[in-house]
Amino acid sequence: LYSPANGEIYCGLVDYLTDWAEEKGYDYVLDEDSYYGHPQETNDLITPEGVVGFVKSLGLSVSVRDYQYQAIYECLKYNRRLLLSPTASGKSLMIYSLVRYHVNANRNVLIVVPTTSLVEQMYKDFKEYGWNVGHYCHKLYAGAEKYTEHEVVISTWQSIYKEPKKFFDKFDAVI
């Protein structure tokens, strides 16, 4: 996870590394990157109450649980989060809420899933939540057109991992 070639680690590990460094009494400095920003950047405009209000404004026909609101809040407040959630815990609903937030803010979103069946499932779930998926979402796998004007691309990692960096430039958020 650490690259000796460039001296970098995955941003998702920063919290673990800083906790370890503090526990051991090490001093450290987190530098801001011109492309990625600061690894512990926060969005001070995001509040738990605001997240609840936003999700309720989506008019979902399903109940949203407290832990789902908390996960959505964490992702929006802290910009970079790794969410671990068990099967049937409503991950699609959490992802949908995050996607809707970003699309409402005029951001393009890339959703990466491990299998083609999950591309289809995510698309279907978004449709069941009442969104016009045909207008907003593009499914990308197994030879589908990679370049689209849709705001949201749902793809398998296998379909995009060999793409040049330029392919990813249009995306403002990756889930």
Regions found by a protein language model. Name each.
Residues 1-30:
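Charged, low-complexity intrinsically disordered regions
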Residues 83, 111, 153-155, 174:
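Hydrophobic positions in the central parallel beta-sheet of the AAA+
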Residues 142-153, 167-171:
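Conserved motor-coupling elements within RecA-like helicase/translocase cores
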Residues 2-4, 20, 31-84:
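Conserved pre-motif I regulatory segment
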Residues 109, 116-144:
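Conserved helix-turn-beta segment of the N-terminal RecA-like "Helicase ATP-binding" lobe
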Residues 86-87, 92, 108-119:
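Conserved strand-helix element at the start of the C-terminal RecA-like helicase core
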Residues 157-159, 165-175:
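SF2 helicase catalytic motif II
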Residues 63, 77-102:
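Walker A/P-loop
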